[in-house]
């Protein structure tokens, strides 16, 4: 069975967020088109996503030194264990759908914490004499992102770092197909905001048939 991991990184729902509204249109249509596929919604604002901190580094260090998981402190076990769970869930999925806003030219920090949890040598990539090699070569990914301005082209394009970062990470993991669906300009041209949103929703529904 095809497994889709629907990863949302927004504190608002589809009634308040452009990206979440487009994401909902996409995933609802996808479920209709692929009723036999399993879709798992991972809401990063509602799930426990540990950040790399002193407990995580300490736990990793103990494990590398030969200690067992049970020998870690309670804090270390909770954080390292959860990061392991997130990584295993990530590598078991066949498709990834990331839904984010653009905040200060990137995405919410909880998504970076999540990526840090799943970027694990030997799991999502490996080191070789020729350099790192991605291990997720049979996956595909989509990023749905709302941007108040216009960043796909023009002078502001080089300022966009959220989608570009995800693109680099997906390449690093070996994911061969990574697409972007952007909701752009609703803040720059507020009188066209609803039209922009409607057009993005229509594109999302179309894409759900081929993704």
Curated annotation (Swiss-Prot):
Known EC number: 1.6.5.-, 1.7.1.17
UniProt-annotated binding residues for FMN: 17-19, 102-105
Glycosyltransferase in keyword set: no
MF (Gene Ontology): electron transfer activity; FMN binding; oxidoreductase activity, acting on NAD(P)H as acceptor; oxidoreductase activity, acting on NAD(P)H, quinone or similar compound as acceptor
Cofactor binding, note field: Binds 1 FMN per subunit.
UniProt xrefs under InterPro entries: Flavodoxin_fold, Flavoprotein-like_sf, FMN-dep_NADH:Q_OxRdtase_AzoR1, NADH:quinone_OxRdtase_FMN_depd
Class of enzymatic activity (EC top level): oxidoreductase
Keyword S-adenosyl-L-methionine set for record: no
Cofactor: FMN
Keywords recorded for this protein, A-Z: Flavoprotein, FMN, NAD, Oxidoreductase
Catalytic activity: 2 a quinone + NADH + H(+) = 2 a 1,4-benzosemiquinone + NAD(+); N,N-dimethyl-1,4-phenylenediamine + anthranilate + 2 NAD(+) = 2-(4-dimethylaminophenyl)diazenylbenzoate + 2 NADH + 2 H(+)
Subunit structure and binding partners: Homodimer.
Function comment: Quinone reductase that provides resistance to thiol-specific stress caused by electrophilic quinones. Also exhibits azoreductase activity. Catalyzes the reductive cleavage of the azo bond in aromatic azo compounds to the corresponding amines.
Family the entry assigns: Belongs to the azoreductase type 1 family.
Protein name: FMN-dependent NADH:quinone oxidoreductase
Organism: Geobacillus stearothermophilus (Bacillus stearothermophilus)
